[in-house]
Amino acid sequence: MTTSAQSSIVNRKSKIGIYWSLTKPLQSGLLLATGLAGYMSARCPIFNMGTILGLTVSLFLAIAGSTVLNMWWDRDIDAKMGRTQKRATSSGAVDENEVLRVGLILSIIGVGIAVAMDALYGLLVFAGLFFDVVVYSIWLKRRTAWSIVWGGISGAMPILAGRALGLGFIDWIGVTLALGILFWIPTHTLTFSMKFEKDYAAACVPTFPSTYGLGFTRATIAVSSVLAALAMVVAGYGIGMDWGFLRLLGVLSAGLLMLAVAITFKPSERVNFGLFKYASVYMLAAMILVVIEVM
């Protein structure tokens, strides 16, 4: 193999790695897990591997595509924040027009597969992408701290879409699961915005801490945590979870509530970071419980 050929392979692998990082694989993976859990919560034939594969591919591509498009749109403000300055989009490591094309291609293929599988499922997947890219990132993120609500709606769509795919319609359990995600997202994102408050201020991005103060932000986290835990337990009961699984979900929810109370009355960097990490563990564990219970 010639030196130029070897260099080409290395460059190709490097670019693939860059684009993989732009999809935020951990975040995208968590949202994908909610979609799969939503589908399985419908107690449909979960071992229909064709449907599961289609759901996995369509959701991941749509989520990854929207994330790449967000990176493309936010490249100017990312360049002003210390934690995001080294992203490929903000550092100029990749061509911005190429990033746009990749984001659009991933999004179109993902939504296209979803629509081909089921019209309602495809509509919900598209709605999640639209709320994330257009409503949240392009329209509201630089204008209001309440943009996280609309970002939360986007994050709630995968689980609603997954359950709708399994049932063929939207029911109250699917809506409750989606509300659990919607209320969980402020717990996750507001702790993050508190930690990086100066970064967001440098980029002139309005956040709850900069707009309403830390006290109101902590109170919002506490309220959203209570609502998220309540919604998940109610949805679990509606699904028909065994009492053993419900008790486990209750224990997980109690942990979330304890940290939310701690950050309200005894705030510290340690508690803030602990809640940020636990929020992700809580949601992933809740989704795993749903999947295990119905199998």
Name each model feature, range by range:
Residues 22-41, 156:
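The first (N-terminal) embedded transmembrane alpha-helix
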Residues 33-37, 41-75, 82-83, 107, ...:
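Membrane-embedded alpha-helical segments that form the functional core of polytopic membrane enzymes
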Residues 61-68, 131-137, 179-197, 229, ...:
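Transmembrane alpha-helical segments that form the membrane-embedded catalytic/substrate-channel core
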Residues 17-27, 88-99, 135-154, 207-219, ...:
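Interhelical loop and helix-boundary elements at the membrane-water interface
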Residues 1-16:
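Short, basic, low-complexity termini and linkers enriched in Ser/Thr/Gly/Pro
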Residues 101-144, 221-278:
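Transmembrane helix-loop-helix
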Residues 160-170, 228-235, 283-295:
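Hydrophobic alpha-helical transmembrane segments in multi-pass integral membrane proteins
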Residues 67-105, 109-110, 183-239:
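Solvent-exposed interhelical
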